[in-house]
Each structure stands twice: as C-alpha cells, then as structure tokens.
Amino acid sequence: MTVAFMLELLQPKEGEIILDVGSGSGWTSALLAEIVGRQGKIFAIERIRKLKEFGEENVRKMGYENVTFLTGNGVRGWPEKARFDKILVNAAAVDIPPALTEQLSPGGKMVIPLDDARGSMVWLGKNEDGTLQERRFSGFAFVPLIDR
C-alpha cells in the first residue's frame, strides 16, 4: 500500500521523464515505465551494484525498454539526465537532498520519505519560479538513504 500511496502522490503521467532513486528490484521502475509509456523515460539509480543488476534484469524480462539504470549515489541524483518531471525516492533521507530539488523541473513533483520521528512521507511541488510547496504525511518506515 505504501508504493500505491507514493505513486498516487507523485501522479506520474504518460511521456514524463522520471528519476527513481533506490530502484532496488526494479518494481517501482517497472510500474513507472508502464505509466509513462514509450514516449516517457525512467532513470533508475541504485547504490548496490548487484541489486541494480537484479533490478535491471527484472525490468528487461518484463519487456520495458524505456528504463536506464545506474549504480550510484541517489542523494546526488543524476545531473547528466536532469531535469526530471518527477522524482520518486524509495529510501528515507535525513533531509531533502538539495541536488534532487535542483534536478526537478519547474512544475515537477517529488515524493521522498524522511527519517524523522513521525516517519514522514513528503510531497514536494516545484513552482515555475523555483520555490517549493510541501505536504507531509506520517506513519511510514523505510530503509535509510545513504550518501555514498
């Protein structure tokens, strides 16, 4: 139910370019690939190489060709592929990484869990002038987003 809630907050749409941070087994990358369709693109980052390879294999087996994987530090995002219409983060950050908000397009949205006392899920919307709107929801638990 957590993934469904995150996707409901993110509101991915056909043709969008989305960054999937902490892509793991490839499950959320595949869901996003289906939603954005052939005109869209998913960029999936996983810091654990073997898990990235596992996710990449799973997504390929399912026939999705619009997903590109990277072994890397999700806190830093993927600046070479930025700007993203949406960013989905699948691990809890201590703070919202500035690199991710910078890589979000004006009009874009990001969903990110925070490692705080409330177990917050944060929805961010980036206005056309670059300012951010924020909504928080509590009661979630995630593995930590590691900066390395």
Predicted regions and their residues:
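Conserved Class I S-adenosyl-L-methionine
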Residues: 123-143
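Short, surface-exposed secondary-structure junctions/capping segments
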Residues: 146-148
